[in-house]
From Swiss-Prot:
Membrane-spanning parts: 124-144, 158-178, 181-201, 218-238, 261-281, 302-322, 335-355, 369-389, 394-414, 441-461
InterPro entries: Glu_permease_IIB, PTrfase_EIIB_Cys, PTS_EIIC, PTS_EIIC_1, PTS_IIB_1, PTS_Sugar-Specific_Components
Provenance organism: Escherichia coli (strain UTI89 / UPEC)
GO MF term list: kinase activity; protein-N(PI)-phosphohistidine-sugar phosphotransferase activity; protein-phosphocysteine-N-acetylmuramate phosphotransferase system transporter activity
Gene Ontology biological process terms in this record: phosphoenolpyruvate-dependent sugar phosphotransferase system
The protein's name: PTS system N-acetylmuramic acid-specific EIIBC component
Lineage: Bacteria, Pseudomonadati, Pseudomonadota, Gammaproteobacteria, Enterobacterales
UniProt xrefs under PANTHER family: PHOSPHOTRANSFERASE SYSTEM TRANSPORT PROTEIN (PTHR30175), PTS SYSTEM N-ACETYLMURAMIC ACID-SPECIFIC EIIBC COMPONENT (PTHR30175:SF3)
Length: 474
């Protein structure tokens, strides 16, 4: 497929989702064009057969067309331009369609709630990856070249320069999350950013670091700005809801002047009195749960084995707040490499299918087109083009991923926990330089590479033995 998404393909997709009048929204994540639809019954599921489309996921009110990284963004931009030129559906007809779809939407409320995380965090993922790669490369060079923290010279300065982006990102991350979360929940982004900043400020007048808020208690009550991302998400949701209620009663002439003012005062009061303590408890509970799962080999196997299923249902973005909580509590994201084993198991399954397929079969062609992205951590082409349509290989791929997760869990249990140096990043082989541990970057890279190898081999063996029987290998 060409670098640019062809207008013919996009027009065909637009026709098969019911035309421009059936489109409620248009956006994208890292690999998928996401089209919100008014009436899902008008969508033709055979979109997945179009050349250049790597898969399709249908929900009650959304069509997700898998293009792959980079292409999804270009597809969304081009589709938005097409929709801008298209005639708009009558408002009464849209309202009628929305009413017909209400019941179906209610049945998938949990999935839609988790999909909010994609809206909040997907715009941040390129920054996570870039900052994490720079930090990983700098750490690897410093380890190999024996550059100490207090070293002087051109090389240490260059390494510190490469590390500064990660420090900047994670220092002010809550403000970015607050902005995106407030928008995702239907509010004004800047209000969410301001409320999030309250979690970043310091409330200890004797502290020598941080940004002092100017007061150390809230009308005599102690302030405990814990919870970080968890608290910020709750506060941003509350901010958006309060803004909506205030706006309903605010005269139009005073809306710009008073709506945000009242919203901030009410939300900040709730944040200091309720949300900060609540967020802290939830943060500690979530960190405790996943830290214990990560240190339990069987728990790691279960997490890695089920992650492909989470990707299929589109709820894998719900793990991102957990990643951020682990970064705060451990200093690295120990869950991400475990879940990455799911993609490695799928690579092994695809290689087994390639080995068992006929020399000139369509299956071999499909595997050749999807295996390189799979090795580099982009799993959707393999999921929707190779393993999931044949089901048994999908199950054996999950088992291969579970074996890789079990390996990483065993190593952590024996005393070498490791993880990603960022809240989010690429998986597959690209993630190798992003691994870190208390023992250094090289042991962490070795553990991750070992896990990938175990998942590849296990996925290959499971699929060869159990995943090719009564399966279409043409």
């Amino acid at each position: 497929m060409a670098k640019e998404i062809s207008s013919e393909l996009l027009n065909t997709i637009l026709t098969r989702v019911g035309g421009p009048g059936n489109i409620a929204s248009c956006g994208n994540c890292m690999t998928r064009l996401r089209l919100g639809v008014h009436d899902s019954s008008l969508v033709d599921p055979d979109i997945k057969t179009l050349e250049g489309v790597k898969g399709v996921i249908l929900t009650s009110d959304q069509v997700q067309v898998v293009f792959g990284p980079g292409k999804a963004h270009r597809a969304a931009k081009a589709m938005s331009e097409l929709l801008g030129e298209a005639p708009v559906q009558d408002a009464a007809e849209i309202a009628a369609q929305n009413k017909r779809q209400l019941k179906a939407r209610q049945t998938s409320g949990v999935q839609q709630f988790l999909a909010k995380f994609a809206t909040i965090f997907t715009p941040l993922i390129p920054g996570f990856i870039a900052a994490g790669l720079l930090l990983g490369i700098a750490t690897l060079i410093a380890t190999v070249m024996h550059v100490t923290a207090d070293a002087q010279g051109t090389l240490p300065d260059a390494l510190n320069f490469m590390k500064v982006f990660s420090k900047g990102l994670f220092t002010f991350l809550v403000i970015l999350v607050g902005y995106n979360a407030a928008q995702a929940f239907g509010g004004t982004g800047v209000n969410g950013a301001i409320i999030a900043a309250l979690f970043l400020l310091g409330y200890n007048p004797t502290a020598t670091t941080g940004y002092y808020a100017g007061f150390h208690d809230f009308f005599g009550l102690p302030i405990d700005p814990r919870g970080n991302i968890i608290g910020v998400l709750i506060a941003a949701w509350a901010c958006a809801r309060i803004e909506g209620m205030v706006r309903r009663f605010m005269p139009d002439d005073l809306d710009m002047l008073l709506t945000s003012l009242i919203t901030l005062l009410i939300t900040a009061t709730l944040a200091y009195l309720i949300i900060m303590p609540l967020g802290g408890w939830l943060f500690e509970g979530m960190s405790w749960l996943f830290m214990h799962l990560n240190s339990n080999p069987l728990g790691c196997a279960v997490l890695a084995g089920l992650f492909l299923i989470a990707v299929v249902f589109g709820v894998h973005q719900g793990f991102i707040p957990v990643y951020l909580a682990l970064m705060d509590s451990q200093g690295f994201n120990s869950l991400f490499p475990i879940l990455s084993m799911a993609g490695a198991g799928q690579v092994g399954a695809a290689l087994a299918l390639y080995w068992r397929a006929q020399p000139h079969s369509a299956l071999r062609s499909q595997v050749r087109g999807a295996i390189i992205p799979g090795l580099l951590g982009v799993g959707e082409p393999l999921i929707y083009g190779v393993t999931l349509p044949r089901m048994k290989p999908f199950v054996t791929a999950c088992l291969g991923g579970a074996a890789g997760g079990l390996f990483i869990g065993l190593i952590a249990w024996w005393g070498l926990p490791m993880g990603l140096n960022s809240a989010f990043g690429p998986s597959g082989l690209v993630a190798l330089p992003l691994m870190t541990s208390a023992q250094g970057i090289l042991p962490a890279m070795a553990v991750y590479a070992g896990g990938i190898l175990v998942a590849w081999v296990s996925g290959f063996i499971f699929t060869t033995l159990f995943g090719c029987r009564n399966v279409n290998l043409d």
